[in-house]
Amino acid sequence: MKKTIILIFFFSNLCLGQHQSAYKNGEWLNFKISYSGWIKAGKASLELNEDKSTGLYHVKAIGKTTGPIKWFFKVEDYYQSYFSSKSGLPKKFIRKINEGGHTKNLTIDFDQISNKA
């Protein structure tokens, strides 16, 4: 029983001591997308920036078709998300897509106080 209490106390302190964010300002990822490994199909990118004045992270995601695939099925997708750098709670989401003629523009504002989107 004594060992169990000591272990619980030890591990609870480890969890409380972690304050480091998983994100860093300026992080980005770029992807080249291919069909069967040799036909260029598209590209995608993710980018994260922190606005110190508002305390928000701004994430941009872009996906587009390239090469011969673009002639048959054109895709241009843009996503943006804003979320708190402290709590991780979302503030705003923007979606603007064009996938082969199917378009959708969507903006969602999140109000954490009234629990509404």
Regions found by a protein language model. Give the residues of each.
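Solvent-exposed helix/loop surface patches that form functional interfaces
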Residues: K24-G26, T103-A117
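Sec-dependent N-terminal signal peptides
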Residues: T4-N13
